[in-house]
From Swiss-Prot:
Lineage: Bacteria, Bacillati, Bacillota, Bacilli, Bacillales
Primary location recorded for the protein, binned into one broad class: membrane
Keywords, in A-Z order: ATP synthesis, Cell membrane, CF(1), Hydrogen ion transport, Ion transport, Membrane, Transport
Oligomer and partners: F-type ATPases have 2 components, CF(1) - the catalytic core - and CF(0) - the membrane proton channel. CF(1) has five subunits: alpha(3), beta(3), gamma(1), delta(1), epsilon(1). CF(0) has three main subunits: a, b and c.
Record protein name field: ATP synthase epsilon chain
UniProt function note: Produces ATP from ADP in the presence of a proton gradient across the membrane.
Naturally occurring in which organism (per UniProt): Halalkalibacterium halodurans (strain ATCC BAA-125 / DSM 18197 / FERM 7344 / JCM 9153 / C-125)
Top-level lineage group: Bacteria
Gene Ontology MF annotations: ATP binding; proton-transporting ATP synthase activity, rotational mechanism
Length: 133
């Protein structure tokens, strides 16, 4: 059975590389499932978990925006930030989530950038979800 070679890369370097059966990413248009021999495309990513399926195993990578480039036998994810579950500092993510929630509450009363606080909350929640906490 054919596989896809996947690279997840950030400005800091490579986060993941391997051959998988299927890749699922969250684009700004919605979920995208990618199988071998998929048509070439480039799509912008949003905050979400990248699911990398190989047999009965599913690996997760927390991604905070970027782009996915798909070729028939290769997928490259150029992410602003990406972390494997083992690399996520759960306490730091929980603290970030709490700070973002407080900022969102203040945004209703003060002149705080609501979209920025909302994005911080989505990033922290995604990291906690991928870490399984």
């Amino acid at each position: 059975m054919p596989t896809l070679h996947v690279n997840v890369v950030t400005p800091d370097g490579k986060v993941y590389e391997g051959d998988v059966d299927m890749v699922s990413v969250k684009t700004v248009e919605g979920e995208l499932g990618i199988l071998p021999r998929h048509i070439p495309l480039v799509a912008p990513l949003t905050v979400g978990a990248v699911r990398l399926k190989k047999g009965s195993t599913v690996d997760l990578v927390a991604v905070s925006g970027g782009f996915v480039e798909v070729r028939p036998d290769q997928v490259t994810i150029l992410a602003e930030a990406a972390e494997l579950p083992s690399d996520i500092d759960v306490e730091r993510a929980r603290s970030a989530k709490e700070r973002a929630e407080k900022r969102l509450q203040q945004a209703k009363q003060e002149n705080i950038d609501f979209k920025r606080a909302e994005l911080s909350l989505r990033r922290a929640t995604n990291r906690l979800d991928v870490a399984g906490r």
